[in-house]
Amino acid sequence: MPVPIKRLNANAPDFEPAFTSLLDRTQPFDASVDQAVRDIIAAVRREGDPALLRLTAQFDQMSLDCAEELEIPPERWRSASESLDCGLREALECASERIRAFHEYQREASWQVEQADGLRLGQQVTALERVGLYVPGGKAAYPSSVLMNAIPARVAGVEELIMVVPTPGGQISDAVLASAHLASVDRVFCIGGAQAVAALAYGTQTVPRVDKIVGPGNIYVATAKQQVFGDVGIDMIAGPSEVVVICDTGANPEWVAMDLFAQAEHDEQAQSIAICTGAGTLERVGEAIDRLLAGMERRSIIEKALAGQGALIEVTSMDQAIEVANRIAPEHLELMIAEPAPWLEKVRHAGAVFCGYQIGRASCRERV
């Protein structure tokens, strides 16, 4: 059965209204979520650990006898690392090394300059003392979230890293714990949701207060970060993730499809768009999507995301493809084209950009 993904032609008379609708990802204000988060934050500030124990039992169905059990001991991280499949462990180690090397280039340096009158001006770069890392643990496990947040913090010189991760039913990914061990996280707590954000922002008898909270999460986590901002630093209010793949006739349609899937499986609200140079390319990508979807473990989530926010857009030239991509301003942009280098400088609005036929995120990922 064909996936009901939108198909647009950038030269069709009805393209503009359809494209505008595709880009309208405004999330309506949910008063019930806002109030629920306020209540959770207030409870954690008022009660501390008892609130965390109660909320963990309520939302993660995990009953603990005491607050000390909220912390996952380092021995558990080490054993998780040792129990990993050899291939996965090597992949995490490789990713860690590359992430660390990349972010070394981003380190800021302090500087001073002396004016003609002897006055000295300068900038003193100082790392934060303690940072809280939120790692999603609901619909999927993301060891990459640990590495991509913890390692840059270490490179920057952050003294202490506190990680929180929800553990529904008491279950937690060994890959996530192994990544915490690999990235030299200091402490890990099995807490999730708005209550975890509140604990990091204000501290409890067991969870230390941090200077800044980073990492992605669901609507409750995002709302909590928004509400505690000002009392603690945050990275951003992250929305649903997105990818745009620009592909020409030489792109492997199955690789394009898998990269669309890799983004769509994050969340039903994730957006995956392929911009195809020509009707033939678009048809081949569409056929690959229909053919491969049945074998995907997270098929239901992928299908909902593609049907709701996904699209295949036909263009007649690379100039038009880049123009459309710049209007979307995606978080991730792939140039699956024969000669990406000349077009890279024309990309004005994108987060991470991946160039070439071999650089698909499903096989390579920005984390590696």
State where each predicted segment sits:
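N-terminal Rossmann-like NAD(P)+-binding subdomain of aldehyde/semialdehyde dehydrogenases
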Residues: M1-E129
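Conserved NAD(P)+-binding/catalytic subdomain of aldehyde/semialdehyde dehydrogenases
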Residues: S184-Q271
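A conserved active-site cap/scaffold subdomain adjacent to cofactor or substrate pockets
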Residues: M236-G308, L312
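Small-residue-rich helix-loop
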Residues: K346-G351
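Conserved small/polar residues in nucleotide/adenosyl-binding loops
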Residues: A362-V368
